[in-house]
Amino acid sequence: MISPTGNESYEEFLNAFRFSFSSVNSYNNCPRCFWLSYLQDPKLEQSENAFAQWGSFMHSIYERFYGGKLDFFDICAEYEDQYHQKVTIQFPPNAWVDLNKKYYEAGLDAIELIDDLPSHISVLDIECKFRLKIRDISFVGYADLILQNTETEDIIIVDHKSKSKFKSKAEQKEYARQLYLY
């Protein structure tokens, strides 16, 4: 287990630990899961799964499109051509729906909605890594897309979610915490 060493207190140890939205959320949902995922030594092996592969693939499409490396007219063809090379693991069985079909179609539906940004919105950064301290506690985060309204100078932070729709306003509020941190 990773824990304080020598004369280091738990407070000093936690102040030295770099938190992320995922680690804070993990602790909030299940402290034991947090310990197993972030503090256990040696670390647990993380196995790949279809959900993670699909999410990474979707993020790569958004990143390349908004970064100017993937043309609007090629985006659907890129998704269809690359899908089975990027999502190589089958989704788990589900009694009510074929998750393989559902996620394929959901991804296609999502990218069909991608549109060029309005002329007054500019891209400041894509997959922006940032570090900050809040009351001496270190945080790290990755913003998918940082935009600016050139008319108002407002900053817009976009976080692409690869999950299905929010089940409730409470769940949506829980996910909004990530944007507040950013």
Descriptions of predicted regions:
Residues 19, 53-57, 102, 174-177, ...:
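Generic recognition of stable, solvent-exposed alpha-helical segments in well-folded globular domains
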Residues 21-70, 104, 127:
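Nuclease catalytic cores
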Residues 128-182:
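Mg2+/Mn2+-dependent nuclease catalytic core
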Residues 46-50, 95, 99, 167-174:
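Conserved aromatic-histidine-acidic binding/catalytic patches
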Residues 1-10:
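Accessory/regulatory regions of helicases
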Residues 11-16, 32-44, 83-87, 157, ...:
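Short amphipathic alpha-helical segments and their helix-coil junctions
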Residues 57-129, 133:
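A non-catalytic, helix-rich entry segment at domain boundaries
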Residues 2, 16-29, 137-148:
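An acidic intrinsically disordered interaction segment
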